[in-house]
Amino acid sequence: MIRHFLALNQFTKEELDGLFTLSRELKDKQKQGVPHRLLEGKSVALIFEKSSTRTRVSFEVGVAQLGAHPLFISSATSQMGRGEPIKDTARVMARYCDGVMIRTYGQEIVEEFARYSSVPVINGLTDLFHPCQIMADLFTVIEYKGGYQGLKFAWVGDGNNMANTWIEAAAILGFDLALACPTGYEPDRQVWDWAQQRATSSITITEDPEEAVRDADVVNTDVWASMGQEQEQKEREAAFQGYCLDDALVALARPDCMVLHCLPAHRGEEITDSVIEGPRSAVWDEAENRLHIQKAIMASLMK
């Protein structure tokens, strides 16, 4: 049976922990200059309907380091952008490639693609979930803290794809999560209900960023207006006043807390320059770890 990586809810705690372990092994080999061409001779299609810097570079480099050949495909220059049915593209790509990564808008697109694909499909981002990023974030936490158990995670800002995926991760892995989101910008209701039924840890939501951040071990945020929401920028700026991760807000967290941001950051909006450049910031290690965790995901699915 073909295994895909579309959302964290497809996986058990043990399976996700296994990916963290493999990621550590691959990162160590890369740092030591030890070849780890686990996908030698394979080809991986990288389909982008949403443009990206980190996703494209980390996947292309990761595919190459695993010994495979990356194929960048933009919807603007492919038949997908001209209305070819997803199921047709999926079946054809599977005849040429050994795996597919898709970065797109609707979660239903990656799910339909996977349904018709005979090779593994990886969700590089949708409007609902961003599983590769949360896995990179958690791998970074493990590196800094030695694990995630017993920690309090705080999310401040939009209840977007990042927040939705953090909620799934907390329910599966069993850590406490406190979210602070303005009214009208809460996480997806179905994701929330699923997590509340499953979670053995505390997953809470408030409108008060100070309440969410207080005594947190990990503090996380993201842009207020995601790609495709640019026309809502002014409205969102007004709604998110008081939700900026600044020195005063971060000071409410534990003294040894770490700050995460998936990037790109709008400094002075959701996070200040002093915080992202400060001693608590793990943002650059977090960005690097996209490479390592995605290699672990690809290797586990495609080798």
From Swiss-Prot:
Q: Which InterPro entries match?
A: Asp/Orn_carbamoyltranf_P-bd, Asp/Orn_carbamoylTrfase, Asp/Orn_carbamoylTrfase_sf, Asp_carbamoyltransf_Asp/Orn-bd, Orn/put_carbamltrans, OTCase_ArgI
On whether Isomerase is a keyword of this UniProt record, the answer is no
What GO biological process terms are annotated to this protein in UniProt? arginine biosynthetic process via ornithine; citrulline biosynthetic process; L-arginine biosynthetic process
- Write down what this protein is called: Ornithine carbamoyltransferase
GO terms of molecular function: amino acid binding; ornithine carbamoyltransferase activity
- What is the annotated localization of this protein? Cytoplasm
Q: Which family does it belong to?
A: Belongs to the aspartate/ornithine carbamoyltransferase superfamily. OTCase family.
Q: What class of enzyme is it?
A: transferase
Keyword terms, alphabetized = Amino-acid biosynthesis, Arginine biosynthesis, Cytoplasm, Transferase
Instruction: Note the HAMAP family from the entry.
Output: OTCase (MF_01109)
* NCBIfam families the record matches: orni_carb_tr, PRK00779.1
Q: Write down the Gene3D superfamilies for this protein, in alphabetical order.
A: Aspartate/ornithine carbamoyltransferase
Look up the record and name the pathway of this protein.
Amino-acid biosynthesis; L-arginine biosynthesis; L-arginine from L-ornithine and carbamoyl phosphate: step 1/3
Q: Where does carbamoyl phosphate bind?
A: S52, T53, R54, T55, Q79, R103, H130, P131, C132, Q133, C262, L263, R290
Q: Which gene encodes it?
A: argF
User: What's this chain's function?
Assistant: Reversibly catalyzes the transfer of the carbamoyl group from carbamoyl phosphate (CP) to the N(epsilon) atom of ornithine (ORN) to produce L-citrulline.
Coarsely, its chief localization is: cytoplasm
- Pfam families assigned: OTCace, OTCace_N
Q: Show the catalytic activity.
A: carbamoyl phosphate + L-ornithine = L-citrulline + phosphate + H(+)
Q: What is its EC number?
A: 2.1.3.3
Q: According to the lineage, what is the superkingdom? A: Bacteria
**What residues does L-ornithine bind to?**
N161, D222, S226, M227
